[in-house]
């Protein structure tokens, strides 16, 4: 697998931009299977149960799925860490019941969140709970663990109810303004997601970026021409490898990344405490990055490539030639373009991997149900670089928008990680720095 870097050269003779493509190895494509769920622990087990309930059976959109998945894993984390005592609770500190089973607490916490959010699935979720709890010996430890998990779930839902506000939104008109995109021309997706209270950030606008490039700028011309040439469905300048990258990340992101997180936890032998912390950090960083991204998207309301390229003669820039029939490789999601949500999402993931491990050198595998392939990344920089290219190859985004999204994701992850720190006094240097 390779990362494709584009170098732009102005050729006066041709009067157009030509791309010189250099190759930098970043990932391998393999056919390796995901480790079996029995190889993990109760956290990976209930992540898979949550994925099935929320995404597969519940058929929830990505943003609501991520909100609910974060509730599940913050509940698990607070329940487990209240027993272990090494880390501060993130949202809820339950009653001090001892002795207590971490596994029972995690199971009860996850179950409590899911049945509240998905009452129609109560029977199957209750059965999953009983099956998981059956592996734990009856007694005070089990009972106390269950009580802790149930308390955490109930109290967390009082803080974050998992509801996305309904907000009226009317698309604008004119150059640079988002409009519904083909083929479905669907209404904007969940504009109220920008008003969901973040789990860690002070506000959704905390890391709001500056505006997208002016339509008269050289950056706009560069990005317009790049996605027009590399992101088009047919007749593009993409290599087969680049086409695979463009399609790879078009799966439901919560399903795709949940599988990757389970694989990572299992392959690295993380115990229940470490798995709970990793899943809570990663999911919270992703969620808050998406809320921040939605805030910026619906603040700037920037148009998508498919709209911009079809109307290239309306932007006041003589260097952006229109193509009235242009359509991207992937279906454009129904929300404004700037910044790119997957840039925020994947960069937040990459930064959490780096902070969790204390190094940017990782072995992180993502598979795609769309392409049937697996990409293995040895550094977080490789993961971040590939998503920037992928959204351009898919025809959904301009390069600058993905880069800006990646910056947001990194900032959000740094902020989120502080909430999952060791108990006060174990990291006095960081405590002083943040005060």
Where is each model-derived feature located?
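Acidic/polar surface patches and capping/hinge elements
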Residues: 30-431, 435
């Amino acid at each position: 697998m390779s990362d494709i870097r584009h170098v732009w050269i102005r050729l006066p003779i041709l009067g157009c931009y030509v791309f010189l493509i250099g190759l930098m190895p970043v990932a391998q494509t393999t056919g390796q299977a995901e480790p079996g769920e029995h190889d993990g622990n109760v956290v990976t087990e209930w992540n898979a149960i949550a994925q099935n309930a929320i995404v597969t059976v519940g058929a929830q959109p990505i943003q609501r799925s991520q909100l609910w998945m974060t509730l599940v894993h913050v509940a698990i984390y607070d329940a487990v860490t209240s027993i272990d005592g090494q880390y501060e609770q993130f949202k809820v500190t339950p009653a001090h019941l001892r002795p207590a089973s971490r596994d029972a607490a995690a199971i009860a916490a996850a179950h409590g969140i899911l049945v509240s959010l998905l009452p129609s699935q109560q029977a199957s979720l209750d059965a999953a709970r009983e099956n998981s709890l059956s592996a734990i010996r009856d007694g005070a430890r089990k009972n106390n663990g269950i009580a802790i998990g149930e308390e955490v779930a109930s109290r967390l839902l009082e803080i974050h109810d998992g509801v996305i506000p309904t907000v009226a939104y009317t698309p604008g008109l004119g150059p640079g303004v988002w409009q519904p995109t083909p083929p479905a021309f669907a209404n904007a997706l969940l504009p109220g997601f920008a008003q969901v209270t973040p789990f860690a950030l002070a506000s959704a606008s905390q890391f709001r970026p500056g505006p997208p490039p002016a339509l008269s700028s050289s950056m706009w011309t560069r990005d317009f021409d790049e996605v027009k040439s590399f992101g088009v469905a047919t007749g593009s300048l993409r290599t087969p490898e680049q086409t695979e990258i463009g399609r790879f990340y078009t799966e439901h992101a919560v399903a795709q990344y949940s599988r990757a997180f389970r694989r990572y936890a299992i392959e690295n032998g993380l115990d229940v405490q470490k798995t709970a912390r990793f899943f809570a950090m990663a999911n919270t960083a992703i969620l808050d990055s998406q809320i921040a991204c939605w805030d910026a998207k619906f603040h700037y309301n920037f148009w998508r490539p498919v709209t911009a390229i079809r109307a290239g003669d309306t932007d006041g820039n003589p260097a952006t030639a229109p193509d009235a029939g242009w359509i991207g490789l992937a279906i454009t999601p129904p929300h404004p373009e700037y910044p790119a949500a997957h840039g925020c999402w994947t960069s937040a993931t990459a930064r959490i991997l780096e902070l969790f491990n204390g190094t940017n050198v990782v072995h992180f595998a993502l598979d795609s149900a769309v392409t049937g392939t697996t990409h293995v990344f040895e550094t977080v920089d490789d993961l971040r670089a590939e998503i920037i290219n992928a959204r351009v190859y898919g025809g959904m985004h301009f390069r600058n928008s993905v880069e800006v999204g990646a910056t947001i994701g990194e900032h959000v992850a740094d902020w989120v990680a502080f909430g999952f720190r060791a108990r006060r006094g174990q990291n006095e240097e960081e405590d002083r720095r943040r005060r």
